[in-house]
Amino acid sequence: MLTLKIFVYTVVTFFVSLFIFGFLSNDPGRNPGER
């Protein structure tokens, strides 16, 4: 049970950091014509 919780926390943290990094890095390059 503890291993499952650690695995879930690791996956959630990984996806959150990946989403934040992708949003920050792709925000100016995703729509360069709007700004």
UniProtKB/Swiss-Prot annotation:
List where the protein spans the membrane. Answer: 4-24
Subcellular location, principal: plastid
Q: Which GO terms describe its biological process?
A: photosynthesis
UniProt keyword terms in alphabetical order: Chloroplast, Membrane, Photosynthesis, Photosystem II, Plastid, Reaction center, Thylakoid, Transmembrane, Transmembrane helix
Its membrane topology = Single-pass membrane protein
Question: Where is this protein localized, as stated in its record?
Answer: Plastid, Chloroplast thylakoid membrane
Which cellular component appears as one GO term in the record?
photosystem II reaction center
Spell out the subunit comment. PSII is composed of 1 copy each of membrane proteins PsbA, PsbB, PsbC, PsbD, PsbE, PsbF, PsbH, PsbI, PsbJ, PsbK, PsbL, PsbM, PsbT, PsbX, PsbY, PsbZ, Psb30/Ycf12, at least 3 peripheral proteins of the oxygen-evolving complex and a large number of cofactors. It forms dimeric complexes.
Protein family according to the UniProt entry: Belongs to the PsbI family.
Function (record text):
One of the components of the core complex of photosystem II (PSII), required for its stability and/or assembly. PSII is a light-driven water:plastoquinone oxidoreductase that uses light energy to abstract electrons from H(2)O, generating O(2) and a proton gradient subsequently used for ATP formation. It consists of a core antenna complex that captures photons, and an electron transfer chain that converts photonic excitation into a charge separation.
**What is this protein called in UniProt?**
Photosystem II reaction center protein I
Name the source organism. Answer: Oltmannsiellopsis viridis
- The record's gene field reads psbI
